[in-house]
Amino acid sequence: MLKLFSAFRKNKIWDFNGGIHPPEMKTQSNGTPLRQVPLAQRFVIPLKQHIGAEGELCVSVGDKVLRGQPLTRGRGKMLPVHAPTSGTVTAIAPHSTAHPSALAELSVIIDADGEDCWIPRDGWADYRSRRREELIERIHQFGVAGLGGAGFPTGVKLQGGGDKIETLIINAAECEPYITADDRLMQDCAAQVVEGIRILAHILQPREILIGIEDNKPQAISMLRAVLADSHDISLRVIPTKYPSGGAKQLTYILTGKQVPHGGRSSDIGVLMQNVGTAYAVKRAVIDGEPITERVVTLTGEAIARPGNVWARLGTPVRHLLNDAGFCPSADQMVIMGGPLMGFTLPWLDVPVVKITNCLLAPSANELGEPQEEQSCIRCSACADACPADLLPQQLYWFSKGQQHDKATTHNIADCIECGACAWVCPSNIPLVQYFRQEKAEIAAIRQEEKRAAEAKARFEARQARLEREKAARLERHKSAAVQPAAKDKDAIAAALARVKEKQAQATQPIVIKAGERPDNSAIIAAREARKAQARAKQAELQQTNDAATVADPRKTAVEAAIARAKARKLEQQQANAEPEEQVDPRKAAVEAAIARAKARKLEQQQANAEPEEQVDPRKAAVEAAIARAKARKLEQQQSNAEPEEQVDPRKAAVEAAIARAKARKLEQQQANAEPEEQVDPRKAAVEAAIARAKARKLEQQQTNAEPEEQVDPRKAAVAAAIARAQAKKAAQQKVVNED
């Protein structure tokens, strides 16, 4: 009794909510064995026949290929595709593929040569001696994908399972009403299917292996039991017929009682599922060394004269398969790829067979009935009762129509398996699955855009962070460069520090003077002499700078001399007219005059030794001197007529007169030494001299006629007479020079 209860608990199955029981139409095609189809003349092989990116092309137009030769390279999740037969690559171009919209995808077009030659095949009959990674890589490189309809790369799926898989489930339910591809494969190739299951078990090392099959396949069940008669590691579970019990989540719950978490995978609960056709493809890839180049396809429907299951080469046009089965199309004939509930209508028949093509249904007009017009939802909740995923299809329908993507996501539209049970029971004939597919596509597009925006933002923030780091590093370098002295500065600083240390050492070192000896002060004396020499050099340099600065323009010097003479005459007149407030000591005046003459001679010598910066034009100098004299006489006349406001110191006047005479002599020497650039007209010079003498006589008469207000000092008069005689001599010399 205990063994009976243990066996009952061991073989227990669970039931999922919802589901439907559509009419069974499997008997149309499951009664005849698998057969081969004649080769087509042209094959179209899309590069992408699986979930993921397409592989990298490794053939070119014009290449000769053999059956099983790779057309692309598979890296990562990129699954390679292989040539279905031998022939020549005639084109690599976009071509319409198995898609509801017949989207064009890049494809390799091969013209068959009819020989159907294989590449050299290397089978691994002793696969148990191979490492797990080697087997997974071989399965991946031989292009094996999920043949149940999803098309997920099998190698990637096995790699992702890892060591956490406890239960391996082989899906043999095949719940669609018309499809019998897996049923017929198990009837004809049960041993090969079981061998493929053992290879998968060797890779995953699960605790249990379960085969789930519906009870509407008695012949397949009997064949599997016969193969598994002597095996105790694989358990065959027969489950009730109910649509969609072949769904991955539904079959997992039926066999294990475990539910796949929302948004998760079956591997999260220790379960991995593979299709019957996938197990057979794994066997051929590992043991026989044959890449996947063909699969079993069900040809059924009342519009086909010879329904059944055939070995269809990948890339074979649908039209070729249907014509071989006796296709008799009507006026409005439709062809469905897949089952009537989860399949889609083909826009035309030139699309190729791919890895996920399991059925081609060509129903008659009476078989599917007249198309019904879509009506408004009546909120009957029949769709919610039939949903195997426990969703609310009527709410998802409203959210999909209203573009309310957030609410649709909140109501778990991603969990919809698109089984079509809701649309099957809908009394309003609403194509709910179409709305859900469109809504999921829009949500996927929105998420893709958000992902791109997030990546762009991350790149921008990374760039900003990089720029900030570079800026901070640049500022740090500048600070370091400013703080750290240059090499020369370092040397100077080091030398200064060395001198300071040496002086400190010398200062702290005691001086010992022995009896009878004199201290050695030679170093101190040498340092003192060096400082004196340095000071003298600086003083000489400063003196040279000052001497260079004192060398002025001769023309400016002539003007200044004329102005000085005018001031001297003005001062003499003021002193002659003014009464001295006090008597002047003759000795002091003589001393001051001698000092003034000495300063004047010194100034003349410095200017005579200095080289003039540029040659002076004698005519310009003479004109400027005449203008200066005229201005001086005019100023003298104005000042002689005006009453002096204050008394002038006679000593200061004598000094200024001596300085003026010195400047006048300097100007005469410069003009005498300067070489005239061009000859001066003697007549003009004589005229100017006559005019000057006339003006001088006129001025003397005016001064003679004027009544002196006060007595004139005899000494001042003598000085003025001497100045006048000097000016007369100068004028005479200038006249002689001009005449020569």
From Swiss-Prot:
Keywords: 4Fe-4S, Cell inner membrane, Cell membrane, Electron transport, Iron, Iron-sulfur, Membrane, Metal-binding, Repeat, Translocase, Transport
Ranges where the 4Fe-4S ferredoxin-type domain occurs: 369-397, 407-436
Membrane topology recorded in Swiss-Prot or TrEMBL: Peripheral membrane protein
Annotated GO CC locations: plasma membrane
Residues binding [4Fe-4S] cluster 2, per UniProt: 387, 416, 419, 422
Subunit field text: The complex is composed of six subunits: RsxA, RsxB, RsxC, RsxD, RsxE and RsxG.
Protein name per its UniProtKB record: Ion-translocating oxidoreductase complex subunit C
Protein species of origin: Escherichia coli (strain SE11)
